[in-house]
Regions:
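Mg2+-dependent endonuclease catalytic cores in nucleic-acid-processing enzymes, primarily RNase H-like
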Residues: 1-94, 115, 120
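Charge-patterned, long linear interaction tracts outside catalytic cores
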Residues: 95-122
Length: 122
């Protein structure tokens, strides 16, 4: 439920001192509920697929992306299993079990970089 999710998000905000939360622009009702009912404010994620993936690849190649392989085992497994569809004209990732955790990482990392004016290429 939204209430359970909000409680979990608030716990993580407090535990990790989180300043920014990015949300899929398709989840506007959740964004509104979070703000109105739970005082959790989210920004719409920048959802550029190829640019976001490229930003993550740079962090990985530079060894600047840390995974808690115990607490983040599912996300780590998804990131290392992510595949591109070889049967499309334009580069497009395969939509499978990896998609949601990888999209969440992409949204968070790329949105934070762009909105904070941080360059991963420096």
């Amino acid at each position: 439920t939204t209430s359970e999710l909000a409680t979990h998000v608030k716990d993580k905000i407090d535990e990790w001192n989180i300043d920014n939360i990015y949300i899929d622009s398709a989840a506007q009702q959740v964004k509104a509920d979070f703000a109105y009912d739970y005082d959790i404010y989210c920004e719409n994620a920048i959802k550029s697929v190829n640019d976001g993936i490229a930003a993550l690849q740079v962090l990985i190649e530079k060894d600047n992306l840390y995974f808690d392989t115990e607490g983040g085992a599912h996300t780590y497994s998804a990131m290392t299993s992510y595949k591109w569809n070889p049967n499309t004209e334009k580069p497009k990732p395969i939509h499978d079990w990896c998609s949601h955790p990888c999209d969440a990482m992409r949204y968070a990392i790329y949105s934070h970089q762009k909105m904070s004016n941080i360059s991963v290429y420096a």
